[in-house]
């Protein structure tokens, strides 16, 4: 059967299969490789590939003859990802995190100089955190707040963070700009933030950043418990679980961490 005489459904199925195959090969695929991989006649594959190239969905390298994903695909993916609700993505991961750690989990976003809780998952039991969805907290005294403000552009950070805004919530609260800036540098280095009884005495919290497709900070996810629950012995396990959850949420939002060069 001539490729032009294929039924529309078969042609569409083959075109989508080709796009997926090329998308999974960073070095690209040639017509022959695609035909062999998908068991499609070379004449049919050639016709569909030319059409996809003409429409901007694929790019063909003249030297190697290999096809790679085109910018049209990127624009479509951005449109799809822009409609993703971070709460919807994060909630099942947060529930799993709570089951794993038996701690309260919060999802927060930055709104002006404050961190706002937009989701909360609690474990079963008698210990309850005095927090709720919609509660606003100054960024300097919470782990989710520090995780948010640590990754915004420096100019915006300096506007948000000022000593006037650093209310002393407990004797352990950071209330000076130099100390907070040093703390935020530590957050960026280790990839997570800690609230060590800085917002409420007897409570210790850990927060990690969530990034979007553009690599910008989108939200932060945090785990909260008593100082007995979050201590020197349990902290490494809690941090590992939290960072893993934040990474999974970020990936579902389209984020891809940059590859580190060997020796860099």
Predicted regions mapped to residue ranges:
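Extended hydrophobic
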Residues: 176-245, 263-264
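Short amphipathic alpha-helical signal-transduction/dimerization elements
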Residues: 23, 145, 149, 153, ...
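Short, acidic, Ser/Thr-enriched surface-loop or helix-capping motifs
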Residues: 62, 110, 211-213
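Short, solvent-exposed recognition segments
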Residues: 126-199
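All-alpha effector-binding/dimerization core of bacterial HTH-type transcriptional repressors
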Residues: 78-126, 151-154, 180-183
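Cysteine/selenocysteine-centered motifs that mediate thiol-based redox chemistry or coordinate metal-sulfur cofactors
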Residues: 156-159, 164-165, 246-264
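N-terminal helix-turn-helix
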Residues: 1-88, 250-255
